[in-house]
Amino acid sequence: MIRHIDLAVQNILEMKEKEPAKFKRLIDEGIMIGLGVDLEDGNKEVTTVDQIKNQNRPKDPEYASVAEAVIEGNNAETVKLISALLEKGKDPTDLVLNALMPGIQTVCELYDIGESYVPEILLANEALMKGVELCQKKKGEVPSQGKVVSLVIVGDLHDIGKNIVAAILRANGFEVIDLGRDVTVEAAVEAVKSTKANLVTGTTLMSTTKGGLKALANALEPEGVPLACGGAAVDRRFVDTFGNSVYGRTPLDAVKIAKEICEGKSWEEARNELY
């Protein structure tokens, strides 16, 4: 039995080198974690559900209750708790970043280890958006920090990550032009021209469509507008293979990149600042 496991691990390691796209897909689907194998770091213990929840749980008990409501996908409870905190005078942006976001972050990390599934992410995302809408309404009109076009690249219909990025950008004072999913390079460039956007954020969940991000970054270069790239199919090594682009691992990275670009820094400077 042990010999069979050793052979399986050897085959998996060979796959990592020879078929990185297939390896990445298996990692994303939680198959490796399900086997109890951590191939990123042989000395690292497999993260548990409790570790993830404890790491992301807000220290403030009221904020922790909001995060838990998001994790459970409980729209009514999320709205109730956020409304009460806003009435107490809590800052809307602080609520988004430190009460709502920890909830969705937890669900996404649980998904990464095979302890959460797409329906649960969808429910948590809906609860998150209900809370964000309340915070945006309370915050009202504020001076825009800049314009960001947000999209999922052509060929990909998965927009949960894009929606989260758009929500957190709006919560931080950016005007977001949301083009939706399955967006062509031509449509994205046209949107940049018509809106005079400062930045484009592009995501993809599938390795088969990530080449579209490279094409988009190249097409945006003559416009002087960089592309912030993210999503399950994308990593820093891939984004570093082409210019006019910055890799963001988390939604908060998108905010950092947007701030750098809207302050007048180049994509190279933004990339160096983030890395």
UniProtKB/Swiss-Prot annotation:
Pfam families: B12-binding, B12-binding_2. Residues 145-272 form the B12-binding domain. Belongs to the methylamine corrinoid protein family. Keywords: Cobalt, Metal-binding. GO terms for cellular component: cytosol. GO terms for biological process: homocysteine metabolic process; tetrahydrofolate metabolic process. CDD domains: corrinoid_protein_B12-BD. Harbors a corrinoid prosthetic group and acts as a methyl group carrier in methanogenesis from methylated-thiols. Residues 53-147 form the B12-binding N-terminal domain. This is Methylated-thiol--corrinoid protein MtsB. The keyword Signal does not apply. Gene3D superfamilies: Cobalamin-binding domain (3.40.50.280), Methionine synthase domain (1.10.1240.10). InterPro entries: Cbl-bd_cap, Cobalamin-bd, Cobalamin-bd_sf, Met_Synthase/Corrinoid, Meth_synthase_dom. Methylcob(III)alamin binds at H158. GO terms for molecular function: cobalamin binding; metal ion binding; methionine synthase activity; methylthiol:coenzyme M methyltransferase activity.
